[in-house]
Amino acid sequence: MKEQKWIHEGLITESLPNGMFRVRLDNEDLILGYVSGKIRRSFMRILPGDRVKVEVSRYDSTRGRIIYRLRNKDSKD
């Protein structure tokens, strides 16, 4: 049976060593996020101020996996 996970959106507030980030979720929770392997392989750069989607386990709601970086509205990409 596959573990159910919650998906939240949040804002990167701080960059930590080894691909870890401090993420403030939209519900004002502060969690520790780590980059998923798919994002790590595609060499995406995640910086403080970026909006991301985070997958949070129901068993440990203090850590989450960053699964998607949302586009900034003001960027020229």
UniProtKB/Swiss-Prot annotation:
> Ranges for the S1-like domain?
1-71
> Mind telling me which Gene3D superfamilies this protein's record contains?
Nucleic acid-binding proteins
Q: Which GO terms describe its molecular function?
A: ribosome binding; rRNA binding; translation initiation factor activity
**Disulfide feature:** none
Localization per record: Plastid, Chloroplast
**What does UniProt give as GO cellular component?**
chloroplast; cytosol
List keywords of the entry alphabetically.
Chloroplast, Initiation factor, Plastid, Protein biosynthesis, RNA-binding, rRNA-binding
SMART domains per the UniProt record, alphabetical:
S1
InterPro entries, per this entry? NA-bd_OB-fold, RNA-binding_domain_S1_IF1, S1_domain, TIF_IF1
| Top-level taxonomic group | Eukaryota
NCBIfam families cross-referenced by the UniProt entry: infA
Database matches in PANTHER family: TRANSLATION INITIATION FACTOR IF-1, CHLOROPLASTIC
Query: What family does the database annotate?
Result: Belongs to the IF-1 family.
What does the record give as the function of this protein? One of the essential components for the initiation of protein synthesis. Stabilizes the binding of IF-2 and IF-3 on the 30S subunit to which N-formylmethionyl-tRNA(fMet) subsequently binds. Helps modulate mRNA selection, yielding the 30S pre-initiation complex (PIC). Upon addition of the 50S ribosomal subunit IF-1, IF-2 and IF-3 are released leaving the mature 70S translation initiation complex.
Note the subunit structure.
Component of the 30S ribosomal translation pre-initiation complex which assembles on the 30S ribosome in the order IF-2 and IF-3, IF-1 and N-formylmethionyl-tRNA(fMet); mRNA recruitment can occur at any time during PIC assembly.
| Protein's recorded name | Translation initiation factor IF-1, chloroplastic
